[in-house]
């Protein structure tokens, strides 16, 4: 509250509060009341509910927006019990962020920088034994007013030896507080099956700041994951899991979710993966209990995806969206904009494509990418033509810049790029996505599907809101629609398929090309780099 900008926070970030109010169904005044009275009341309760003085060490792990609440409670504990050692760690304390937090917030005694499995236990043992003069590598401390730190460059190599998380205290306290009125029916269990990113080891996505200094991919064996999920499900009486892996081990598709599918389990699982999944893989995930996934779809522009180093194409993203819809898997995705080297054409292509995709799940949001610490854009900005202008705007309203070096604790940053994209195109694309989201939230939900008869297919197109259409396609168009249904096909593959199913009829390449052009113009097929993919979903449930 000593920050002179603190009072301006709600006004400066009014659009954020308005969006939060819409999503939560609460008025903005509710959040003002929560900050002004609810948070202090909670801190008072937290200090009285637990005898903090009985402990020698109190630890906090902090990620994203957990920071201020954790620092506030830690200060109260330290003020009342000065002999208690306060230890911080987590993603918000990686790299120089941890060292600056330790310097600025004097009630913090130690910071674990990076992974803590091999560092935190010996630190606690040394504190308990009164041997705090020799600290493990990777632990920062304060000595005679100076910050002392020797980095630990060794990654935690025995990730497979970690067991399932222990949620006993959490659920016991939730029950005591009456926090589970649904009797645990909505209970969700978080689980980590792997750490790091196997794609990032080879190609670090240019905007991504996840994994910090621990990109190396490490994963538990599928059999171990099965055993641990079984244990957690039984112990905490829940079949809902959220895998916190940045990207799942691809072995999990068949060897984990394939097993769940074969056993006909009724699970509800969230995963993060890559979008270049085949139809069969999405089917296996869905039948194995995946109800929602984040496949890293960030754009529908080939040039932008190349700029990000995503290693996927718009066609693969569209495939993922289509088969996820067919198998009832919610997809969490976004359209990111504002990249270096992007052009008006990148925007026009997406503006042209989106009307074809209105029946598919829309992105959750659209906007300029965040410039995140640890990303290639942050570590090598000049290589990409980026000028970092300072920490994210919100930091100066949350932390007092007279006390904290915001450049050192910030995770996201403001930046400038020499944009050449027309503001009108930016707004047109943004509005198109807003309209797409509105259609899906309304009773007028778009659709595009086809049914198969003995010798023709019928396409039902409800993407245009004012004129839904029913179109019959006889052979050879019907064959093309079916051939390109599961995966993209080239003209040569389509021509060969027609020859097999043509009952002696011959179609020369020119006539096939005309048919393809007509189906693309109708937005029944999507064409990309010489391949064609059917956008309509089959009504048949046996694919």
Language-model features and meaning:
Residues 66-68, 94-96, 120, 147-148, ...:
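Flexible loop/turn segments at secondary-structure boundaries
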